[in-house]
Amino acid sequence: VPSIIFGLLGLAIFLNVMHLPRSAPVVGGMVLALMTLPTIIIATRASLKAVPPSIREAAIGLGATKFQTVNHHLLPLSLPGILTGTILGMSRALGESAPLLMIGMVAFIVDIPGSFTDSATVLPIQIYLWKSTAARGFLELTAAGVMVLLTFLILMNGLAVYIRQRFETKW
């Protein structure tokens, strides 16, 4: 689903129906959470299905309840895939700007927001604003912002790969 659709959904539901303030971090967080949910859900389902049925059957056969089977066998074995999907979803949300533009996170904010309903901006939009400014001094800020964003993306994706390789068990 294109990310702009999630921005329109956030605009319709969170701003028009729930009457939350424009460019509030809580609205941006809810829109990005909705956007990353499909990635996390698909990774979680794939990770849960990857656990062999013989492990479930063996736990049930030894007298474990369904809750104990899920809690002690299924979740620990599928946790690396779940964490990997979560981190990849978060790294996708880190670089998104289209849904946040739809809810009004475009202004330059001078002060640090004091609450979740104060106006705020995000780094991809701030990079765009710095790049579109004609002043020469913003060129260094743009480059630094891009480097910070890329560093976070590389670290998050590296963490996802590390978690996947470190905790994945071979059947």
Task: Explain the meaning of each model-derived region.
Residues 5-8, 27, 34-56, 83, ...:
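Membrane-embedded alpha-helices of multi-pass transport/permease systems
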Residues 23-26, 33, 37, 55, ...:
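Alpha-helical membrane-protein architecture signal
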Residues 43-44, 66-104:
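Transmembrane alpha-helices
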